[in-house]
Amino acid sequence: MMIFEKKPILYSLFVFTGSTIGITAKILQSIKSYGTSFKHPFMYSFILFSSETTGILTYKYCFQKEDEESLPKEESITKMKAQIHILTIPAVFDLFSSFFGMLSYENLPASITTMFDGGNTICVFLLSLFFLKNTHSKNNFIGVFLLIIGLFFISLSAIKDKNNSVDEESENKSGFVQTIVGIFCCIFCNIFTALHAITEEYIFKTRIIHPIKLIGFEGLFGTIFSFVFILFFSHIKFSRSIDFLCIKDKETGNVYIENFYIAIKQIIEEKQILFLLVLLFFLFIIYNYCYITITKVTNATTNIVLYNLTALFIWIFFLIPIHKQENQERIGILQCIGFLILILGVCVYNDVFTKNANLDESEIKNLITETSQITDDSLVI
């Protein structure tokens, strides 16, 4: 695990796995099997949380002994009892975040959806300001303002290119409606992602808990919750007026937001789906470890900012003219402008332009001391 302690490697793995997950999810949704696309938002959540559950075994056999020895025994037991139930809160937030995230992938181009994650930074900023009472600089406020402008241009780009996101199953619906629904799904995803990140940051600040332990038990609760939602929605029929959000049973003609039985039939009929789901499972393991470790060693906002970098790689991948028509993307002026403003906003938010120019008081004193020493040495010579 020493490799994850080096921040450049940690950040690189985070961005790489995040990009690959987005690309894989978009490809999965375009695969037709059993007469419909593989659109199962809670199924993706189930895969995500199942991968997180492996953290329980990792913690037990790799970290538990060292972790418990670092605290007095009685305090360790008290903390352990207090920690388990509280992890249901971030698990619920993560469940709804992944649900709305997958719905946005279904209704918007992959790069647009990923760029909208810039809204996570805005939500984390606001929540940390009001709930964690974190202090923010003037650059943070300017950065958030630029992020809002950037997202506005990206929204205009998505609406302008609405026809590019309309597939065969939604020909009876306006591409405009589908795009607006996708944008709102992105907004809800941002809110729940921010709540999830802030909750985890709060837990780290108020509890003594190993990050792998947090991943494992959060995944356990999330797996249970997502499976319950899968079974529940498998028996709930929806109106065909929202069929662009749903999967259709080719035998009965009914449409569902989620259906476990159709998913199994699709996996049996198309083996590529099974391969990509297994790939997602292992990608999630690496990604989640990086995610929680970055939150532990830095803060939730840094975590979100790094994830925004994946948009560039996803966009480049889907610009290559090798994809199905519904996945193929193109370079749009509004999207380029919005993305550049997003990058500028992220840089301003993180003081990239001023961080190296500003010296604190101790650094100034050290610089004066070193300069004086050099001057004295020159006089001696």
Language model features with spans:
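Polytopic endomembrane small-metabolite transporters, centered on the Drug/Metabolite Transporter
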Residues: M1-I381
